[in-house]
């Protein structure tokens, strides 16, 4: 899949890089002991450090450091055993210190990579430039008072990982796949919950365009704080088309920060884009360099779970799944665990088909996740056993599954209570076939005359007469014997 924009003077390709701000899973903030609980009353989780009271000194949260290293290892990135915190100087009402504690020249994590699973089954690689730790700012609220803006400092000082990609993406779909994969990895690791709707994962989107076939990077614009995968993809498309129009009309794209308006489907200028020197970075004199040894990194490495790519490869090898099915199943750790329970001792492909197409489809329709599924992995496995043992046929299995989604009942009990066992008595099926043929002599003659497509119609009628319980293979054999000899 290639995303190109045709213009009057050239065909343009899009160049995209993402800066993802991921809130670290930790009960306390990066440099203070204040809680990070979401949804608490305004200014109820603010320490003297968070409010930048004079004389208050930051103390590093060791868990946040470990979480950053875990994430770096999950991204197959270089871990820098010595990094430095720096002050990023700028003024804003919700930044009480007048600077943000971040990392600049020496981040905690260096280059890595993320492998994307695309919808067409292909894989693509996106480079990671760096990951650094920094503190979040507070929140300005403009809708709480008719004439004043208010400040909530609950978020001030919360630990963030800023994960900066290389400009390796060439289409909106790749950016979407990158965000989904990054979120999946961090959820497996337990380092970020990835809830974009709560602001715990936000993306700054860097977009530029260039004529196809050229290699120079043109001026980019940054779209700030986009809070959903869908909006990121829409923002890239809108901004790319805007830039193409500017270049095609003889103008020049200015380096600036922009905002995306989802309602209008367009980006608008926010301010001219700052350069690094505008922030006057310098090492924070209140914090020593962050140093750890190889033993610490290895200890963290040994604690890593099986990650999505490794799990996907195992599912392909152990269960014979297609790369696409395996990638769908491993997006969420809970989904993968559910599938493994269903597939244990059973045909992996059949289990994957039922989990992906039947269960996931029904749950999406009901607005639920696997954790809230009324159908347990054990009961779905029992349903597949009934199907394999030919106690029920495929059509009845779907009916039983619908009842299970509504009630959560055991499939064995449903089949017995409702008398849904498959009819495998040859004489009973023959009687039903004879009755349908006798009632439709003209159609029977048409089949004998060569219109074999009508056999499907007869199958449907017999199934209707037996309430869907006739064994399909036996039914087909009997029909063919009686109508085609």
Curated annotation (Swiss-Prot):
Pfam families: GatB_N (PF02934), GatB_Yqey (PF02637). This is Aspartyl/glutamyl-tRNA(Asn/Gln) amidotransferase subunit B. Belongs to the GatB/GatE family. GatB subfamily. It catalyses: L-glutamyl-tRNA(Gln) + L-glutamine + ATP + H2O = L-glutaminyl-tRNA(Gln) + L-glutamate + ADP + phosphate + H(+); L-aspartyl-tRNA(Asn) + L-glutamine + ATP + H2O = L-asparaginyl-tRNA(Asn) + L-glutamate + ADP + phosphate + 2 H(+). GO terms for biological process: glutaminyl-tRNAGln biosynthesis via transamidation; translation. The keyword Ribonucleoprotein does not apply. HAMAP family: GatB (MF_00121). It is an enzyme of class 6 (ligase). NCBIfam families: gatB, PRK05477.1-2, PRK05477.1-4, PRK05477.1-5.
């Amino acid at each position: 899949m290639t995303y190109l924009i045709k213009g009057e003077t050239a065909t343009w390709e899009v160049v995209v890089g993402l800066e993802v701000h991921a809130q670290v899973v930790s009960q306390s903030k990066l440099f203070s002991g204040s809680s990070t609980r979401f949804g608490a009353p305004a200014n109820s989780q603010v320490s003297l450090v968070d409010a930048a009271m004079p004389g208050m000194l930051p103390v590093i949260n060791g868990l946040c450091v470990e979480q950053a290293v875990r994430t770096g290892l999950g991204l197959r990135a270089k871990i820098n055993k010595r990094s430095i915190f720096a002050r990023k100087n700028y003024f804003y009402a919700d930044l009480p210190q007048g600077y943000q504690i971040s990392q600049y020249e020496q981040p905690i994590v260096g280059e890595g990579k993320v492998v994307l699973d695309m919808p067409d089954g292909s894989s693509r690689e996106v480079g990671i430039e760096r990951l650094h730790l920094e503190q979040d700012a507070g929140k300005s609220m403009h809708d709480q008072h008719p004439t004043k803006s208010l400040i909530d400092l609950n978020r001030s000082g919360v630990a963030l990982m800023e994960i900066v990609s290389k400009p390796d993406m060439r289409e909106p779909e790749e950016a979407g796949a990158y965000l989904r994969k990054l979120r999946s990895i961090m959820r497996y690791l337990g380092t970020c919950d990835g809830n974009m709707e709560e602001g715990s994962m936000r993306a700054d989107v860097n977009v530029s365009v260039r004529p196809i076939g050229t290699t120079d990077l043109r001026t980019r614009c940054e779209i700030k704080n986009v809070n959903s995968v869908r909006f990121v993809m829409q923002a890239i498309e809108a901004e790319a088309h805007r830039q193409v129009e500017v270049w095609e009309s003889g103008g020049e794209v200015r380096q600036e920060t922009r905002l995306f308006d989802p309602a209008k489907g367009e980006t608008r200028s926010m301010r001219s884009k700052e350069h690094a020197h505008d922030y006057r970075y310098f090492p924070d004199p209140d914090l020593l360099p962050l140093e750890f040894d190889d033993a610490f990194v290895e200890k963290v490495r040994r604690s890593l779970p099986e990650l999505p790519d490794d799990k996907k490869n195992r599912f392909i090898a152990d269960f014979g799944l297609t790369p696409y099915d395996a990638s769908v199943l491993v997006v969420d750790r809970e989904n993968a665990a559910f599938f493994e329970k269903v597939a244990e001792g059973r045909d992996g492909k059949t289990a994957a088909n039922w989990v992906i197409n039947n269960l996931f489809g029904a749950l999406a329709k009901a607005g639920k996740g696997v954790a809230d599924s009324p159908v347990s992995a054990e009961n779905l496995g029992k349903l597949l056993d009934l199907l394999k043992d030919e106690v029920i046929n495929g059509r009845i299995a779907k009916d039983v599954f619908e009842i299970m989604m509504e009630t959560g009942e055991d499939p064995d009990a449903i089949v017995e209570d409702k008398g849904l066992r498959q009819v495998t008595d040859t004489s009973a099926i023959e009687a039903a076939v004879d009755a349908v043929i006798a009632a439709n002599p003209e159609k029977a003659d048409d089949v004998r005359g060569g219109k074999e497509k009508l056999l499907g119609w007869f199958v449907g009628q017999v199934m209707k007469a037996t309430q869907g319980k006739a064994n399909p293979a036996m039914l087909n054999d009997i029909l063919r014997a009686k109508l085609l000899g």
